[in-house]
A protein has these predicted regions:
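Extracytoplasmic copper-binding redox domains, predominantly the cupredoxin/blue-copper superfamily
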Residues: 18-157
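Sec-dependent signal peptide recognition
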Residues: 2-9
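C-terminal motif of bacterial Sec signal peptides marking the signal peptidase cleavage site
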Residues: 13-16
Length: 157
């Protein structure tokens, strides 16, 4: 009799604990790539300007160190000598709304508003000013800022 009671108890226990019918878990809905991607930068529409990054044996500098361009122009920064160099902008020294535009138009940033390091001579870093608001954009070379390597781009409409 004890065996029958034991078997019956086990059958009840198995029935009570097992076989819950759960709906299969659904994977979270995928976010479309268009929602995740940053806003596309406007296409450049203007002139291309060249700025050389140089060391003349005494000083590090951008040539030219000041430049006036139009919204839509592109500036190519060339590592001519004395590298590595980069170009970075002070967030508090650019026009309102410019940080978002530069963020979209500066490829391979090391950090916000700071372009990639150009370690190879003759390397070029291009920045489009498409959609850039008018005003002054003060920039510098991170490795050589303490040695005075800085400049300014003025964007006109």
């Amino acid at each position: 009799m004890q065996k029958i009671s034991l078997i019956a108890g086990l059958a009840v226990l198995v029935a009570a604990c097992g076989g819950e019918n759960k709906a299969p878990e659904q994977a979270p809905a995928a976010t479309p790539a268009a929602e995740m991607a940053p806003a596309a930068a406007p296409a450049p529409t203007g002139t291309t300007h060249d700025v050389n990054m140089e060391f003349d044996g005494k000083t590090y500098h951008f040539v030219p160190s000041t430049l006036t361009i139009k919204a839509g122009d592109v500036v190519n920064f060339h590592n001519v000598s004395g590298g590595p160099h980069n170009v970075a902008f002070w967030a508090d020294s650019i026009p309102a709304g410019a940080a978002a535009v530069l963020g979209a138009n500066m490829p391979d940033q090391m950090q916000p508003l700071s372009g990639t390091m150009l370690v190879v001579q003759d390397a070029v870093y291009s920045i489009s000013f498409a959609g850039a608001p008018e005003g002054e954009y003060k920039f510098y070379c991170l490795p050589h800022l303490a040695m005075g390597m800085k400049g300014m781009i003025t964007v006109e409409d």
